[in-house]
């Protein structure tokens, strides 16, 4: 239903926002280490009914697999991620992405927006994640370069 899709869009936006908060206000990895781990959210077009929150252990602004996993969010009710877009500039068109990593590093609330198409990787100004219901209703979660997260 439309309400369930709206709720899902808000859940995804909230998960990204929590990742942002934990990344910006993170504790030291080990007391006294002065190492503050980057946090991120990972979206994969081929895993379109889930997404991952992670700690960027190797500090490369992308998800490195199970050793970096914090939590996997499963998308319910046959809703799915139908499109992931990267935008090089605020006025550019969508570049459809295979993978998207949004990472937040203390003290900056602005995300690093890293997208991949095949083996080609690029930094983007901002990104959108489109979720779609079985009835074809869609919502966009927009992650702006200034750290704002919106639902359209």
Q: What does each model-found stretch correspond to?
A:
Residues 1-21, 25-152:
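N-terminal helix-rich module
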């Amino acid at each position: 239903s439309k309400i369930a899709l709206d709720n899902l869009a808000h859940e995804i936006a909230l998960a990204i926002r929590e990742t942002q908060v934990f990344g910006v206000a993170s504790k030291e990895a080990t007391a006294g280490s002065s190492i503050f781990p980057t946090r991120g959210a990972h979206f994969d077009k081929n895993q379109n009914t889930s997404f991952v929150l992670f700690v960027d252990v190797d500090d490369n602004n992308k998800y490195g697999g199970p050793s970096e996993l914090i939590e996997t969010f499963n998308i319910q009710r046959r809703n799915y991620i139908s499109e992931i877009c990267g935008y090089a500039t605020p006025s550019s068109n969508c570049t459809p992405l295979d993978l998207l990593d949004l990472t937040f590093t203390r003290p900056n609330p602005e995300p690093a927006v890293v997208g991949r198409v095949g083996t080609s990787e690029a930094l983007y100004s901002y990104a959108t994640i489109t979720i779609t219901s079985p009835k074809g209703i869609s919502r966009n979660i927009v992650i702006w370069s200034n750290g704002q997260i919106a639902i359209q």
